[in-house]
Amino acid sequence: MKFSCEKETLLNLLNIASRAVTGKSSMPLLEGLLLAADADTLTITGYDLSMGIRTTAQVDVVEPGRIVLNSRLFCEIVRKLPQDVVYLETDDKLMTTIKCGRSVFNLMASEADEYPALADVASDKGLSLPQPILKSMIAQTIFSVSDNESKPIHTGCQFEIEGSRLNVVAVDGYRLSVRRETVEGVPGDMKFVVPGASLREIERILGDDDDIVEIFPDSKNILFRIGGTTLITRLIDGEFLNYRAAIPKEFEHEVSADRQELIQCIERVSLIVSEKLKNPIRFHFDGSYVQMSCVTAIGKSYDECPFDGSIENLEIGFNNRYILEALRAAGDEQVKLQLKGALNPMIISPMEGDKYTYLVLPVRLKAND
């Protein structure tokens, strides 16, 4: 194999494909990246048997071929190379020479024939939508994905297609996030759960322009095609929470608040909260203000924030991080807050429509909180 390309072209491919490479594996080949040069195209693949990423770019190919190079070392070498054209050549004994400027490296490659093939996705039912929309749907829900492996189904986001509606849902037992979007050309109703780790990689790959991302799920795997990059990952089996039943239908109180002002107040009160001192924040709604306070072993904090509407003497506790993550994800200038009582969840939603819904369960307050 022999090809050349600009350093940035090669580095971009490596930065994407290497995200699917495991650090340690009983199969040494899985610690490597598969490089395949053919015609005027270089394809680099990373795979950990659960998620695979294959990404392609045009390069100057002199001799086609396929090899596997250790991902960590190869990526580190390319990052340190000068900004110039990179020349890569492999001889018949798999000795690979990498040249760039005055830098020269010789690495022993592995045979590519034993590198496992990415999972096949047997589906002709695809969904297409602009990359920024999928990116925002992931960003506005992924923080609610559970990290508790005892219930694997909730370590991913549920994608639910009903009619022309796409809903992305995440839940971790303490909060629930739903992001809704109207899409065109949907293949029919379906549900599937995509691992949170895979969605975080997809979010990194997605661009901010209006290019299309194509999504093809089957019964076991799902394929995301994003320009010259393809990501394939296993789906998670199991029974996802009936999230509609979890969202209250009736509330005693409904007010609105300036989202940024609310965030800033909570951030200030949270300054005395840490990983070791995780006391909840006490929210005291009284009149048209919410008074926030917190007590930990290192001190006390207090602030207050106005809102539109009126609530008489409601006191409720929340985990500061859960509330902040929901408010930051919302994005709107004004948000609607709906509450029922001190032991009921709070709902954060837009002033109009139902583009997103965030449910946060309260924390039972103690006298010294």
Question: Which role does the model predict for each range below?
Answer:
Residues 1-369:
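Structural preference for solvent-exposed beta-strand-turn elements
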